Amino acid sequence: MTPWVPAVRRTVPHLPEVVLSALFVALFLVWSWLVLTGCTAAVDRIRPLFLPPRSYAGQIAEAFSLVTHPLVIVIAIAGVTVFSFRRRMRRLALALTVAAAGIPLQTILALTTHRARPHTAFADSISHFGGAYPASHVTAMTLGAWVLVTLTRAHRRPTSSVAQWVGVGVGAVALTAACQWIMGLAHLSDIVGGLLLGAAVANLALSAGGVDSILSAWARLGLPRESTDKRAAVIFNPAKFDDLSLLRRRVEAEVLAA
């Protein structure tokens, strides 16, 4: 009975992420059923004005679509994952691996549902590949924005800086969604599906890696590894803190940074 109690308590910090992940998965499944049964046909009939591919706006949209291509995003996330693992930030590497896995998962779902893309003048674009549901670029950019915000938080930035990067991430996702819709590469329902899938995988990644573990590991980045003569006095309640190794890493990071 004694070993079982700490195991239960260790899951408590991850509970919000697990709940949010389950919620977004449920919403994604419900929305997918509505889309694939044709219940969102009225929403999908809302179409943007025709955008000539060779116009200035068309070329800018296609260039942005290339930058936010899922292959580009997954390579970027994989690079940060390898960097994190080599720096022994294994919890962060685990979370990033789960996030990166969301992009091939989207590809599998798109091939499985095999939903036709809307008629578009950008049919020859490199972004026009695979099925339409869920929207590939939106899913990838949602995960990419999550990685950006997570790394910003983990790098111990001020609250105002974190808020700014959250705004940048949200803006990038919104711009990606608008670009995909304006180019006629995705229906509105496909975009909503991409957002829900990306949010579900992002919260699953957080629950797998653990917020506190990620923040503690990244906080030590760039700090001296050699021992110092600095000391710290810590007063804590053992009944409320079961992960002593995490406490030690956080205290070491604070001492080395002081």
Which ranges hold each PLM region?
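Alpha-helical transmembrane segments of integral membrane proteins
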Residues: P16-L23, R90-V98, Q164-V168, D190-G193
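Alpha-helical transmembrane spans of integral membrane proteins, capturing the lipid-embedded, hydrophobic core
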Residues: A22-V25, V74, L96-P104, V173, ...
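Membrane-embedded catalytic cores of phosphoryl/pyrophosphoryl-handling enzymes
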Residues: F122-G222
